C-alpha cells in the first residue's frame, strides 16, 4: 500500500458523525456579545417611543370613505404634520380603517392623542393612541 492510500477502517475510526445542525462555529454563539438598542427600565415600560423620524400616533376607526385631506384637517390643529400614511384595501379602494400620523415633537403628538381621542370624524368616533411604545422588560426565559 502506498502513502496516498488509506485503509477504510482508519477513515471510519477518525470520522465524526454530524447531526446536521449547522457548522461547529455556531456552537460559540453564547460567547458573542450583541449591541443593545435601548435599555428600558420598568418605570418607562409602556411609555411612548420615538420612531426614527418623529412621533407617530395610530388612529383607528376611520370611516372607509375618508380622504387624506379629511385626516390632515382633523389632526393639523394640534401641530405640524410631517407625514400621514393611509392604507387602502386593494380590492375595494377604500381605507382599511386606520391611519398613521407623524408629528415632529412629542408635545404635538400628546396633544393630538389627548384632544382627538373619541372625537367625531365623518360620523365615526376615532380612537387615537401611540403607534410605538416601549415594551415590558423580559427575563429572557420562556
Swiss-Prot record:
GO terms for cellular component: cytoplasm; exon-exon junction complex; nuclear speck; nucleus. Residues 55-133 form the RRM domain. It holds the Pfam family RRM_1. Heterodimer with mag-1/MAGOH. Part of the mRNA splicing-dependent exon junction complex (EJC) complex; the core complex contains CASC3, EIF4A3, mag-1/MAGOH and rnp-4/RBM8A. Interacts with rsr-1/SRm160. Disruption phenotype: RNAi-mediated knockdown results in embryonic lethality due to developmental arrest during morphogenesis. RNAi-mediated knockdown at the L1 larval stage results in increased sperm production and no oocyte production. Its main location: cytoplasm. InterPro entries: Nucleotide-bd_a/b_plait_sf, RBD_domain_sf, RNA-bd_8, RRM_dom, RRM_RBM8. RNA-binding protein which binds to pre-mRNA, spliced mRNA and spliceosomal snRNAs. Preferentially binds to the spliceosomal snRNP U2. Core component of the splicing-dependent multiprotein exon junction complex (EJC) deposited at splice junctions on mRNAs. Positively regulates the nuclear export of spliced mRNAs including the sex determination gene tra-2. Promotes oogenesis by repressing germline masculinization and spermatogenesis. Required for embryonic development, possibly through positively regulating the expression of pie-1. Not required for the spatial patterning of pie-1 in embryos. Residues 1-26 are annotated as: Disordered. It comes from Caenorhabditis elegans. It is found in: Cytoplasm; Nucleus; Nucleus speckle. This is RNA-binding protein rnp-4. PANTHER family: RNA-BINDING PROTEIN 8A. GO terms for molecular function: mRNA binding; pre-mRNA binding; U2 snRNA binding. Keywords: Cytoplasm, mRNA processing, mRNA splicing, mRNA transport, Nucleus, RNA-binding, Transport. The keyword Transport applies. Belongs to the RBM8A family. Gene3D superfamilies: 3.30.70.330. Expressed in somatic cells and germline cells. Residues 1-10 have a biased composition (Acidic residues). The gene is rnp-4. GO terms for biological process: embryonic morphogenesis; feminization of hermaphroditic germ-line; mRNA processing; mRNA transport; nuclear mRNA surveillance; positive regulation of oogenesis; RNA splicing. It comes from the Eukaryota.
Amino acid at each position: 500500500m502506498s502513502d496516498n492510500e488509506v485503509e477504510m477502517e482508519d477513515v471510519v475510526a477518525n470520522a465524526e458523525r454530524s447531526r446536521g445542525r449547522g457548522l461547529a462555529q455556531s456552537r460559540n454563539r453564547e460567547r458573542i456579545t450583541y449591541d443593545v438598542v435601548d435599555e428600558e427600565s420598568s418605570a418607562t415600560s409602556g411609555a411612548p417611543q420615538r420612531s426614527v423620524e418623529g412621533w407617530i400616533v395610530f388612529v383607528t376607526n376611520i370611516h372607509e370613505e375618508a380622504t387624506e385631506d379629511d385626516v390632515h384637517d382633523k389632526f393639523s390643529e394640534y401641530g405640524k404634520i410631517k407625514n400621514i400614511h393611509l392604507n387602502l384595501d386593494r380590492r375595494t379602494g377604500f381605507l382599511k380603517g386606520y391611519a398613521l400620523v407623524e408629528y415632529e415633537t412629542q408635545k404635538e403628538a400628546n396633544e393630538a392623542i389627548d384632544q382627538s381621542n373619541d372625537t367625531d370624524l365623518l360620523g365615526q368616533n376615532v380612537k387615537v393612541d401611540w403607534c410605538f411604545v416601549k415594551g415590558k422588560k423580559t427575563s429572557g426565559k420562556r
